[in-house]
Amino acid sequence: MIALRLTRASELKPQAVSWLWPGRLALGSRSLLSGDPGLGKTFLALDWCARLSSGRPMPDGSPNPGPANAIVLSGEDDPKQTIRPRLEALGADLDRVFIPNPSDDFVDGPCLPSQWKQLDEAVAARDARLLVIDPITEFLDAGISLNSDVAARRALRPLKRLATRHQCAVLVLRHLNKSGRGPSIYRGGGSIGLLGACRSDWVVGRDPTQPDISVLAQVKNNLGPRQPSLAYRFEGGDGAPPNLVWLGTSSLQADQLVGPAGGGVKEKAGERARRVLKEIHALHLDFERVLGPANGDDRQVLDDWE
């Protein structure tokens, strides 16, 4: 058995947070970017990769540690048809942005948590400062459900080790759940444990008063003060990648974009109860994996909930 080694708190040297995007994306940390399809989550992530690769300021004018390398794992967009053209349009240094080799076994990317070491080696070999996983559901081992708190944390735990070891910012993309109701902290797909495992969460949503404008807003940020929301829109296109235009700050907050204020519908008591029971059910299944199957009475209660 390996002994647990302990260190006195007095022996630890205080360390300030290092930022890829000051106040928003921390180096050595995991962050979430959440939103419905069609609002440009992938485009935003590629924009940040492009800015890092070329050393250009971030959308709010703040600096980044570039020029530096980035790795993009995309499970939904074709690298040749979509990823490269977008990066090029965004002004990326294409020699500094890496994707899995199409001729490799990991044509889309490694699965988590079983193949995290291959990913760790890739980050080390390329000295990457940003790792984008888009979306997280495409890169999970078979049988891993993000609706399970324990499973979600287990899948993301190796990414914490990777981020800390290489001082790399890990950006995990996910879709919103289908409820369409409730505060933003509960709108991200999967268990609340996914949010708990990451140090920051950012959400994109449409401006309710200007449908052609979308907004990036903070859901949570454990490592820095609250940051202002940023508005953006896409212009052009017509067969070519559209232009991403950042429009400055917005007064809209996350709950106004995806919660009751934005949707105009308040979560009903019955819906809230069903959501809570589903979370309890997922937690019960986690305990079953550790402590063994439930007895008959417990199983009947769970069946009644369903």
Predicted feature locations:
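N-terminal pre-Walker A segment at the start of P-loop NTPase domains
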Residues: M1-L20
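C-terminal regions of RecA-like/P-loop NTPase motor modules
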Residues: L4, A124-D127, R165-H166, D207-E306
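Conserved inter-motif catalytic segment of the P-loop NTP-binding fold
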Residues: Q15-A16, L20-P22, A26, P37-L39, ...
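Phosphate-binding/switch region of NTP-binding enzymes
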Residues: L32-L33, G38, T42-F43, L130, ...
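Hydrophobic positions on the alpha1 helix immediately C-terminal to the Walker A/P-loop
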Residues: L44, W48
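Gly/Ala-rich phosphate-binding loop of Rossmann-like dinucleotide-binding domains
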Residues: S53
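Short helix/loop segment immediately N-terminal to the Walker
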Residues: M58-P65, G180, F287-G296
